[in-house]
Swiss-Prot record:
Keywords: Repeat, Transferase. It comes from the Bacteria. This is Probable maltose O-acetyltransferase. It comes from Bacillus subtilis (strain 168). The gene is maa. Homodimer. Its EC number is 2.3.1.79. Acetyl-CoA binds at residues 84, 141, 159, 164-165, 179, 182. The record marks 84 as: Transition state stabilizer. The active site is at 114 (proton donor/acceptor). One of its GO terms (molecular function) is O-acyltransferase activity. It catalyses: D-maltose + acetyl-CoA = 1-O-acetylmaltose + CoA.
């Protein structure tokens, strides 16, 4: 049975990101994001838009504008999580963010990747790897979380870090690439 490009994308296989269905879904997400980013803070419409855009949203989740993502429906955020402004989540695969997380301004979370081989990359195909962020994680400003990374519970990611590998629970990591600085 042939798989759709969307099914390939969700499975982390090479897929054509210019597929018509995917183009329409990204366009729909951009429309919701634009509305979200332009809606006043005290407006209940913002919560409604967030629930329409994302795969799941826990109780008392705050995402400050501006916020950007590819599709939205791959993003799942737990209760009492705060996402500061200028967050970008490229969600071609699942992104799970736990409960009681703090995400500082300008954090980027990427699930999208491209083939290293230049001929394959020229084809326009890409792939994704999921990102999982545990409970009570604090990600500092301008940190970058790369595809396929899992961050354990209670971890702290220092500002400006580039996280390329899994982060154990109860650790502080920092640098480019991020490395363990301290056990908590």
């Amino acid at each position: 049975m042939l798989r759709t490009e969307k099914e390939k994308m969700a499975a982390g296989e090479l897929y054509n990101s210019e597929d018509q269905q995917l183009l329409l879904e990204r366009k729909h997400a951009r429309q919701l994001i634009r509305q979200y980013n332009e809606t006043p803070e005290d407006d209940a419409v913002r919560t409604k838009l967030l629930k329409e855009l994302l795969g799941s949203v826990g109780d008392q989740v705050t995402i400050l504008p501006t916020f950007r993502c590819d599709y939205g429906y791959h993003i799942h955020i737990g209760d009492h999580t705060f996402v500061n402004f200028d967050c970008v989540i490229l969600d071609v695969c699942e992104v799970r963010i736990g409960c009681h997380c703090l995400i500082a301004p300008g954090v980027h979370i990427y699930t999208a990747g491209h083939p290293l081989d230049p001929i394959e990359r020229k084809s326009g195909k890409e792939f994704g790897k999921p990102v999982t962020i545990g409970d009570q994680v604090w990600i500092g400003g301008r940190a970058v979380i790369n595809p396929g990374v899992t961050i354990g519970d209670n971890a702290v990611i220092a500002s400006g870090s580039v996280v390329t590998k899994d982060v154990p629970a109860n650790t502080v990591v920092g640098g480019n690439p991020a490395r363990i600085l301290k056990q908590l």
